Amino acid sequence: MGARIAVIGAGHVGLVMAAGLAELGHDVTAVDVNDALIVGLRKARVPFHEAGLVKLVEQGLASGQLHFTNTYDEAIPEADFIFLAVDTPPTLAGAADLRNIRNATRSIAGTLNGKAPIIINKSTSPIGTGRRPSSSAVLMRNRPRMVVSRSDWSFTVLANAR
């Protein structure tokens, strides 16, 4: 059996990642605040074109490896890994608007129940976002943690350091 994975955001990045991880044998739950999107995804209705994605979603649903919810409580408490794949639209000044990342980290922190999963940020965000208090302090409060950050396009990881 694979890892238990939560993917926060079921848009272009999150949905493709969730379906791919489910195909690899992981138990994946994708969370999105868009209720209509979740209702559609539970019926394998993918709202954008990505070659082969509908088939992957159908297979994931049929195998029981892929789940969709609008509730963090259904995805976070048992997750070994959490991928953040939320929208970060540009502000009027052109910088990334990190409100969705902040909101997601607060929601994650509220459902961790003492567990300390590895959290990977796949959202488009400036270098060092994982080190900023607005992004990581809520998750790191009263928990020994280490922040590992890559300065290239890959990802930022907030992880255990026990």
Language-model-derived ranges and their functions:
Residues M1-R45:
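NAD(P)+-binding Rossmann beta1-loop-alpha1 motif at the extreme N-terminus of oxidoreductases
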Residues I8, G20, Q65, A75, ...:
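N-terminal glycine-rich phosphate-binding loop for ADP-containing cofactors
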Residues A19-A22, I76, T105, A109:
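A structural alpha-helix within SAM-dependent methyltransferase catalytic domains
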Residues V33, R45-Q59:
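Basic, amphipathic N-terminal segments that precede the first structured/catalytic domain
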Residues L53-D80, P90, A109-N113:
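A structured beta-alpha segment of the ubiquitous adenosine-cofactor-binding alpha/beta core
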Residues E78, L84-V86, K122:
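Short, well-ordered coil/turn residues at beta-beta hairpins
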Residues P90-A137:
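Rossmann-like NAD(P)(H) cofactor-binding subdomain of soluble oxidoreductases
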Residues R131-S136, R141-R145, S149-F155, A159-R162:
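Low-acidity, Ser/Thr- and Arg-rich intrinsically disordered low-complexity segments
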